[in-house]
Amino acid sequence: TDATGKPIKCMAAIAWEAKKPLSIEEVEVAPPKSGEVRIKILHSGVCHTDAYTLEGIDPEGIFPVILGHEGAGIVESIGEGVTSVKPGDTVIPLYVPQCYECKFCLNPKTNLCQKIRVTQGKGVMPDGTTRFTCKGKEVFHFMGCSTFSEFTVVAEISIAKVNPKAALDKVCLLGCGISTGYGAALNTAAVEKGSNCAVWGLGAVGLAVAMGCKAAGAARIIGIDINESKFEIGKKFGITEFVNPKKFCKSVQKVLGEMTDVGVDFTFECIGNVGVMRAALESCHKGWGTSVIVGVAAHGEEISTRPFQLVTGRVWKGTAFGGFKSRDSVPKLVDDYMNKKLLLDEFVSHKLSFKKINEAFDLMHKGESIRAVLDIPE
């Protein structure tokens, strides 16, 4: 039935407050306003960033909210002035938009479009209001996406139109985790052929980093995790050797120094632990080693090292969404997946129905899943 211009009633997973399980409720999704698009979400991954907000440690976290930012679906209707997509198009919502106009979009050095940053951070659409209501209460948006809902409304600049033949239960992962890790290696670090790399944290993002290092032609890729159940799967993504830091009485810096003759060319922290970030930098090769921070640390945490580490030629960098300019890159990444240039299926360890969403969070916290993907319409 055509609901263009009218509100849609559907099911969504609502976070009413921090530290409480999500609750599946009927919500009303308003039609898209000017420059907005309403999307029928078919699949969504569950990411640590969703948990970060749910646990109440995100300073921008506001409740009640519909979480989820790793989704894929079909355009249901478009607001006034929208030209880049039409109803029926296959799309991936983007938490890093690309407006093509702000000074960030015009600068090739960054992918951090700022056009709707302020309102997105406040959980509202660019006009300052929300499109979700539940039981008469306004419900906030999350990261400009809110994919834990059968329908969502996003800004046109936050949408990648992708190949309609793509398997949406796989390419939804390009909305966050896989693009983030893969691009950290290819774009931010610009890993070189024949180099040695080390990756801390072998979840979906760390494994995607390894996949990027392999694509760049790295000679050795060392995977570091205290959960050894991740080691076997790591081999699929190109990791050549594994280190469990708990098995050594010396620092991981020393262990890697001995393994690589002085240090590693490229290191990646995919956990969000500031102590590990320091270890990753200090494991870098003197004179040219580069360390990339990919993990999100808790609010207010600070990094430290001795300036001598940088004076002697190490570089410390950070990355968001893998440095990919989102609307330009995500459609190409989908094509790369379809042309077997990058893996996605191997990241999906669990497929769950929407009503089992809290189970997906439990699996993630226990370290039992790489990525759980939800089938959104029941």
UniProtKB/Swiss-Prot annotation:
Its EC number is 1.1.1.1, 1.1.1.-, 1.1.1.284. GO terms for biological process: formaldehyde catabolic process. Zn(2+) 2 binds at C99, C102, C105, C113. Its cofactor is Zn(2+). The record marks R117 as: Important for FDH activity and activation by fatty acids. Pfam families: ADH_N, ADH_zinc_N. Homodimer. Class-III ADH is remarkably ineffective in oxidizing ethanol, but it readily catalyzes the oxidation of long-chain primary alcohols and the oxidation of S-(hydroxymethyl) glutathione. The modification N-acetylthreonine is found at T1. PROSITE patterns: ADH_ZINC. Binds 2 Zn(2+) ions per subunit. This is Alcohol dehydrogenase class-3. Belongs to the zinc-containing alcohol dehydrogenase family. Class-III subfamily. It is an enzyme of class 1 (oxidoreductase). Gene3D superfamilies: Medium-chain alcohol dehydrogenases, catalytic domain (3.90.180.10), NAD(P)-binding Rossmann-like Domain (3.40.50.720). Zn(2+) 1 binds at C47, H69, C176. It comes from Octopus vulgaris (Common octopus). One of its GO terms (molecular function) is zinc ion binding. It catalyses: a primary alcohol + NAD(+) = an aldehyde + NADH + H(+); a secondary alcohol + NAD(+) = a ketone + NADH + H(+); S-(hydroxymethyl)glutathione + NADP(+) = S-formylglutathione + NADPH + H(+); S-(hydroxymethyl)glutathione + NAD(+) = S-formylglutathione + NADH + H(+). Keywords: Acetylation, Cytoplasm, Metal-binding, NAD, Oxidoreductase, Zinc.
